[in-house]
Amino acid sequence: MYKFFDDKGRIMVLRPDMTIPIARVVGTKFKDSNPPLRFRYTANVFRVNESLGGKKNEYTDCGVELIGLTDEESDLEILVTALDSLKVLKNNNFKFEIGNINFFNAAVSDLDLSEEEREKLAELIDTKSLKSLEDYLEELNVSEDYKAFFKKLPWLFGGEEVLAEGKKYAFNEELKKNIEYLESLANSLKELGYGDMLTFDLGMVPGLNYYTGIIFRGYFEGVGVTVLSGGRYDNLISQFGRDIPAVGFSIKLDSLLGVIEYDDTKKPSKYKIYYGKGYALEAIKKAKLLRDSGHVVELIPKEDTDGIESKEELK
C-alpha cells in the first residue's frame, strides 16, 4: 500500500481496493438500512507492484457488492453477475475460476502456525511456487501428512473433476463440506447454462485476508493480469460497527481495453424481480433472460411472495 503522513503526522493510505471503503459506508451511513443492500462503483485504486513487473500501480476498478445475505442463492447471484459481466464484452476467450478460502482455512485451523507463517504458506500455494513451497514446509513444524496435503493443493485446479479429486485429500468433515458447497454451486451454474465456462482452483488463497467463503477470478486470453476478482467477506463490515455478511467483485477496467466489443447504443429498461423461498434459481434464470436482452435487473428475496413476480420501473 502507498502510505504517507499528513501535516499532523497521521498515517494516510491510498485505497488499495474499494471493498473496505464500502464496508465503512455500510457500517456508518447505512447502519439502519434494511438488507439486502446493493452497491455499484467505479473508482481509481492504488497498489504497489514490483518495478518493471508489467503491472500498473494505479487502475480503475468497477464493481458490485451484495450486502446482507449469506445463503447459497446470494453467492449464486453474484457469480452469475460476474460471468455475465465478462460475457457482455462479446469476447468468449475468458477463463473463470472458483475456489473456497475455507478449504485452506479448514486445513490450517488445527496447526500451531503464526499469522505470518499462515500468510506465507497461503502466498506460496496461491502463486503455485512449488519449489519455494516445498522448502518452506520443511521449515514449519507440521506432520508429513500435512506437508503432503499442502504440496498437493497447488495442483488441484481444472474442470469439475478437480472437486471429486479434492475430496480424496479431504481429511476432515469441514474440508469435505467446503468442496460439497462448490459442487452445489457448480450444479446450479450448469443448470443456468454456464457449465462450459467454469474451472475450479482449490489452491486459490488470495492475499487479501478478509475473505470468508467463495472466491473467484476472471481472465482473458492475451491479458497478462486478473481482470475480475471477488468473493465473500462476512466479517469485514463488523469492523465498522455493523455485523452483516457480504459478497462482491470488481473488474479492472484498464485491463479490458484491448478485449472490449460492447454495443452501448441500446437504452436498457430496469426491472425488479421478487422471489419467494425456494424460487431463487427460477428468479436468476428470468433475470438472465432480461440481462441478455440488455436490461438492468435487481433480484429481491421476499418472504411473503409465493413464486416470482417482476416489475418494470417507469422511466
Ranges and model annotations:
Residues 58-62, 98-106:
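Short, conserved phosphate-binding/catalytic loop or strand-edge motifs used
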Residues 101, 105-136:
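Short terminal or interdomain "cap/linker" segment that borders an active site or interface and mediates
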Residues 14, 99, 251:
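A conserved hydrophobic position in a structured secondary element of the catalytic/binding core
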Residues 1, 110-112, 214, 313-314:
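Short low-complexity, flexible loop/linker segments enriched in glycine and/or proline
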Residues 8, 17-32, 39-91, 138-315:
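Positively charged, Gly/Ser-enriched RNA/tRNA-binding surfaces
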Residues 1-14:
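Short, structured active-site "lid" loops
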Residues 94-96:
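A short amphipathic beta-strand at an alpha->beta junction
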